[in-house]
């Protein structure tokens, strides 16, 4: 079993220099064209309310494009320049798209209740919040989105001063209609992402954008990047050394991409630029394929256990991580040994194979520690590595 575990955790010692600069993986926003919708028709309050009411019905695409045009038209340019200049400064290519004729008044209006809350004083905030909420469907499926609306939307909307969003229609049929027109790579999706980036550029409203959508829009891969950076800081470890200690053979390809992405994000000036890089992958059709994130649950589990030793409560996030119970115990022990290894001074210490051998021995002993709090099922036995290495 020890040899199988060592084989699984191969590390990245064979990956040097130029191999990390994978030419087949492009993360830069310059590969993305962001549409800026505009309307030749004056967008009065009644037209905006009609568009809001039709989101989630057969007129969803037209309604959302008109709402994008309204937000762009109403956004006040910052000191950094116009809306277009801000997005171009982040490296995106822009194109202007006419929304065409106004929405048909005969379309169904599943979000009429939300539309009725709109007045002149709150129209921009409500419409922007609605776009942010709809954008979550680029990541969540209908069931997860319904759960999000039920459990989180009211609290987040109220905390960000857009309590009207509690009237958003979270019926699964309505969510399915919205999700059908918002997919990575589609023009409407890119237009909404452009609006998110504009909001992130303004310190006065950046917190709202982050709270309602941006942190979720960055994708699982960026969650792991954040955990990795936090763990490296906590340990005082060189990122390359820590990555070698964590990396399993099955995730080497994904790790290459994550290493490169971390480098680019670290060099990006300002929060909007950092999210611009992150989102540039979400805006392409190949985003979910680009990271082998399903294989990275084990690494995430170890990182959370490391960070929990410095920030109590981090490990509560492990509830949603699907790994087997034996690996949960192993992850805690690996985290403990990594803390001892680095001890805040970045020492290289023993190699990954020896560290994992010691962790495995300790995790099987009687002094492993408290019982697991989670009641989750073990991994699917068909997932690579689990049944052979950890059972």
Swiss-Prot record:
Coiled coil: none annotated. Keywords: Capsid protein, Helical capsid protein, Host cytoplasm, Phosphoprotein, Ribonucleoprotein, RNA-binding, Viral nucleoprotein, Virion. Encapsidates the genome, protecting it from nucleases. If expressed without protein P it binds non-specifically RNA and therefore can bind it's own mRNA. Interaction with protein P abolishes any non-specific RNA binding, and prevents phosphorylation. The soluble N-P complex encapsidates specifically the genomic RNA, with protein N protecting the genome like a pearl necklace. The encapsidated genomic RNA is termed the nucleocapsid (NC) and serves as template for viral transcription and replication. Protein N binds protein P in the NC through a different interaction, and can be phosphorylated. It comes from Infectious hematopoietic necrosis virus (strain WRAC). This is Nucleoprotein. It holds the Pfam family Rhabdo_ncap_2. The keyword Phosphoprotein applies. GO terms for molecular function: RNA binding. Residues 346-391 are annotated as: Disordered. One of its GO terms (cellular component) is viral nucleocapsid. It is found in: Virion; Host cytoplasm. Belongs to the novirhabdovirus nucleocapsid protein family.
